Each structure stands twice: as structure tokens, then as C-alpha cells.
Amino acid sequence: MTLNTFTNNHLNEVASTCQKVIPWFEGIDDKNVQEKRNSLEVKLCSLIEEAKTAYDVLPVKTTVGVFGASQAGKSYLVSTLASFGGDDLTATFDGKKVSFFNHMNPIGGDFEATGIVTRFTKFDDKGVSGFPIKVKVFNEADLVKVLINSYNSDLNLKAVPAGSQSDYLSAQNQKIGSTEFLKNFFEDLKSDKYALKDEKSYIRDYDVVSIAKYAIRKSKSDFGDNAKFPIDCYFWSECRKLVSKLNFAGRAKMFSILWNELDAFTTLFTELGKQLLELEGASSVYVPLNCFIEDPNANENDFRRREDGTLLDIGVLKNVFKDKDDPCKSVEVVIVNDGNEIKKTISFASLTFAAREFSFPLPKESNADGFDVLDFPGCRSRKTDEIEKFKDPNTDTTEYLRRGKVGYLFELYCDRHEIDVLLWCV
């Protein structure tokens, strides 16, 4: 079985057309049109997101997802489904034979071992010379959702901070429920200090609608109450209108209200968001073998995993702040834009966060005939921490990236309808 008949679906043109329609409202004086403008723009933004997703997903083979807490069970299932007779899963990249289990897949420890979805497929993207492995990556909107996920799943929002009469959740609801607060909040964002000037921004109005939908679903605050904060309400409408006009500091301020302006989470957004800007909004990049192999120039028989963790190793995220200014801890990647190969440099820890899927090509004799296998990171139960712990400067905030990313990944693939059959490992 080859790629399905939806390869040339032209849904990208639907998305592009909808994007061109939105500015049309600016020149229309008709009162009836203007009254419906906001809701129509939201619907168009939703259609853009859905069309872009369908354009990406429809051409892909039927997918079998493998998900669950059992790492050993998942590895066995993946090996059975994707290999030939239980053989080792190997592939050739830039003329070098690499083993998935021996050279790429991390060894589990006391937390989730992997933080990326692996697609085992017979569709072989040869990549770029020197950068043979294709990796799909998060964008800024995904980063916001990861932080929303962790803030609402990993923290005790019902706790009452010292010296306060209200718990964190009640205080947040009181703040965002104030018309005066929101008015002043957006007036400040419209000031010149937050205006987009020489910087680049790759987040769009339709991304805000996607974030709004996610916040409605995940937030424990009133942001999760569709009656109080529907996607066409004042708050989300102002965010949607402003987002493409804001510099990075402005976007950090705007999105921080979604996690009640918790400094630790805003710092995570700031550090990773700046790194994501280096990828210029790309949905995928090509990476070199040294993202997995300690010395790709060694003899194949001497290949071994990167000593500080491979791109699949979610434990690498603990180095997000440690490695940001160390050029030795950076990696060069390639973005392909309109046929042009553009090299970019990003910290390896940040790339490990950004990476959401990488493709491992299967041999023709593989058991996966006619379908792809998606190996998801192992899931773990979530625990709720006290927000007071952030007063300790030694608190490792990167663990919330780990928890949020693993939790968000599976939701993302479900939302995008990228899983046709799910095998649950217990």
C-alpha cells in the first residue's frame, strides 16, 4: 500500500483562501456584517486550522498507535509490528546503519524515558545531505498549550498562599473576571513597548483560536468555562487581534495570564519561545546523526548513544537553562522552505523539547505492510505540587515541561485524527 488517494487534496489552498478572507472585513461598512464579524472570523480561523491539519494528515497511511504505561510492553509490541520476525529495527541514514533500540531509544529511568513520537514507516524521506532525519516540531502555540497542560494538571491550584484569603484559583478567577482588569491589561499590551518592529513572529490569529479551544478544555479556572470565556468572547477576540502585532515580550505577557502570571512558567515560555523563533515557524526540520550518535564518524560497530542523551530522551530537558549559552551544546538543523535549504542553530535541549515526531524508515520486508506504527511516550500518572515550591530557587521547573509535553502529545495526535487504531499497553 502506498500513500492514499488524498495526497493531492488541495486543502492548503482552502486554508490560504480563508486567510485572505479575514482582512476583507476591514473595508465593509455594512452594520449586519460588522455585527457578525467577530464570530465569522473565529469560524474562519477554525476552518484554517482544520484545513491545514487535514492537508497534512490525509495523505498519511493508516496509523496504529501504541500507548500506555508499560515501556517493556510497548517495546515488544512495536518490535513485533514493525520488524521482520522480531529482528532488530535498523535503518540506513547517510549510508550508515543505525539501530533504533541500541542507538536512538533512551534507557528508561525513574520518569518517562522518551518525549517524542516515533513513526515507523515504509515511506522513506531521504532528508538532506548531512541531515538525514526528518523531525516534526512544535510551534509557539504548542508551547503555550504544553504550559497550560502542566499548570492545570501538575499544580495544586486550590492551595491558599501565605498571607492570602483566597486560593490561587479563586484569585485568578477574580482577576480575569474583572472588566477593568482586562481593559487595562489589553491597553498595556497595545503600548509601544510591546509593538512588533524589527522582530519576526510566526504565530497567527488562527493559532489563538486553537489555544482558546485547548484552554476551554483543560483550564480549571474560568478560562475553562465556555459560558464565561467562549472562543468569541472579548478576551479571546482581543488576543486574536493583537497576537500578530506583538513582539515576543508582548506575547509572553499576553499568554502568561493563562497560567496566572506564574513567573516560573513565564520563564519557561520565554526561554523556549526564543529558541523556537530560530526555527522560523517551520513544522519540520532535518537533523544530523549526532542528535543520536556520540560519534557519527566512527565505525558502525562502534556506534553508541549520545552520552548526554539522544533527541528522544526527555531527560535532556533538564538542561534547557544550563545549555542555552554553551555553543558546544547546540546543534545545527536544516529547514527546507520552497526548495531552499536553510541552516539554523538551536540548543540541543530546546530542540529536544520542540521535537514531537521523528520518522524511522522500515525495510520492505517489515510486518508493517500498509500502515505506520506510532510509538508514543510512556504515560505516567500526574501529581499535583504546591506552587509555594517555586519560592525555592533550586526548584527544577523543567520537570513541568516534561510532564506537560508527554501529556499534550497524545492529545495533539487525537485532536489531529492521526491515530486510526490504538493499542493500549498496561
Predicted regions and their residues:
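Inter-motif core of Ras-like GTPase G domains
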Residues: R382-V426
